[in-house]
Regions:
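C-terminal motif of bacterial Sec signal peptides marking the signal peptidase cleavage site
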Residues: 10-13
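Bacterial signal peptide processing site
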Residues: 15-17
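Ser/Thr/Asn(+Pro)-rich, low-complexity disordered segments
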Residues: 23-443
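Gram-negative bacterial Sec-dependent N-terminal signal peptides
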Residues: 2-8
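N-terminal export leaders
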Residues: 1-2, 404
Length: 443
């Protein structure tokens, strides 16, 4: 079992995932050096279960992925998410690499989705609606054309373009990407909008501070058609700031904020003039573990189980509905924010596997071993559970299952990074945004 971590040792343990500053991203997460055979076997099983979600919830005709599904596989959910479908596309590429499906099957599954999205699904200047009917592609009521969800779909499409270069997938994926009017989505200023609705126009919110939007901005800056100016990358605030063990980091409490962009873009070996985004995600993860342990001391009856063994807060289901919970918060007072009630969300450490390996894999293995099939089943981990009350979500959510799949694979091989970063959009984005390769050359 992975040893418990605390204090400065926790910081160095996060760096272990990099292993050697002189190797590639793929080598930086290779299982032969970074993880034990037992941990690799655990991740292999977790990955395969996670991918099963994207196999079984894909509509047979459209390939669109259900936004959520019963953890026991008994559901028939009609709503697809475009972000969910983007994770599914990346999952198809991983499945081929791992030998779960053939290359022909991976190409066929990806082509089905991409052709349907290109030819059948309504869009506004290239931007799709966040939630659509899984079988028809029609917009779900009141669903916006969400920019971040579009980015998560497109980055999945571009990953398949590099995974299957000898097929027609690259041409289809690039058609979808190139018709997106990124400049229009600025609405005349330096910040991309959250989205657009036909009933009201642009949503009354912009991407102006540190959040999960880095993948969105970089795709917009790196676009071949209708890109936004590189100055837009510099315009947003790298804050607000918190401090953990003497290091400042830009924060937002739910951990998915620090994981989605990092699953695709290589922030380990490339840095800009503003911030070390990889280190920032490590600090955010470790600060959350520390905060949850202090919550356990302050609220032992409700949260006494929070520990190195049981931690993880990110947006998820809760007993009373969907919650955007996380930790820590800007206010220095130690208290449970946003209704935090002792719930543990496995996708929080799941999405941090490649960022902070040891504490993340430790809690996931503990959760599987301690609670068994109550929390670990057909699609991997249930979306959330509360060890104190015994509540367990009946559902798995596609985006949470997806980030766990991607980061488990990045931990083992670096495959998602190395595949996506070959795409010209990724290369252009880093060049235009001023990222420099800090990787030392091989000797």
């Amino acid at each position: 079992m992975v040893p418990l971590l605390a204090g400065v040792s926790g910081l160095s343990s996060c760096k272990k995932v990099e292993k050697n500053e002189e190797v590639t991203v793929a080598q930086a997460s290779a299982s032969s050096d970074a993880i034990s055979a037992e941990d690799d076997a655990f991740l292999a099983d977790l990955e395969r279960r996670c991918y099963r979600y994207f196999e079984e919830t894909a509509d047979p005709d459209t390939g669109l992925i259900a936004d959520r599904w019963k953890a026991d596989g008994s559901d028939t959910w009609d709503t697809a998410g475009i972000a969910a479908t983007g994770f599914g596309l990346t999952g198809h590429a991983i499945a081929v690499k791992r030998g779960w499906i053939t290359e022909d099957e991976g190409i066929a599954r990806s082509r089905k989705v991409l052709l349907f999205m290109r030819d059948k699904v309504e869009h506004k200047r290239g931007f799709y609606y966040q939630f659509i009917n899984r079988s028809t592609g029609e917009r779900e009521p009141n669903s916006p054309a969400s920019t971040i969800d579009n980015a998560l779909f497109v980055v999945g499409a571009l990953t398949t373009a590099e995974a299957f270069p000898d097929s027609d997938i690259p041409a289809i994926a690039n058609e979808i990407y190139n018709r997106m009017d990124w400049a229009w989505m600025l609405d005349g200023n330096d910040f991309l909008q959250y989205g657009w609705k036909p009933e009201e126009g642009f949503l009354k919110a912009e991407w102006k501070t540190y959040c999960e939007h880095m993948v969105l901005l970089l795709l917009a800056v790196g676009a071949e058609k209708n890109p936004i100016p590189p100055a837009c990358w510099d315009a947003w605030e790298r804050g607000p700031l918190l401090e953990f063990q003497g290091e400042k980091f830009a924060h937002y409490p739910p951990l998915f904020i620090h994981q989605y962009s990092q699953a695709y873009f290589d922030f380990q070996n490339y840095k800009d003039k503003h911030l070390d985004y990889w280190r920032n995600s490590q600090l955010a993860t470790l600060a959350q573990i520390d905060y949850m342990k202090r919550l356990a001391e302050a609220y032992p009856d409700q949260m006494g189980h929070y520990s190195d063994d049981l931690w993880g807060l990110t947006a998820s289901d809760g007993p009373d509905g969907y919650k955007d919970w996380g930790a820590p918060y800007k206010d220095p007072r130690l208290r449970p924010w946003r209704g935090v009630d002792g719930t543990v969300v496995p996708s929080a450490p799941g999405g941090s596997l490649a960022i902070c390996l040891e504490p993340s894999i430790h809690t996931l293995r503990v959760q599987k071993e301690r609670f068994g099939d109550k929390v670990y089943g057909r699609y991997g981990f249930a979306n959330a559970h509360n060890p104190r009350t015994g509540w367990v979500s009946q559902y798995c959510l596609a985006i949470d299952t997806g980030i766990t799949l991607l980061m488990a694979e990045n931990t083992r091989s670096g495959y998602v990074w190395n595949t996506f970063m070959k795409h010209p959009a990724a290369v252009r984005a880093f060049e235009r945004a001023g990222f420099k390769n800090i990787q030392k050359p091989n000797k």
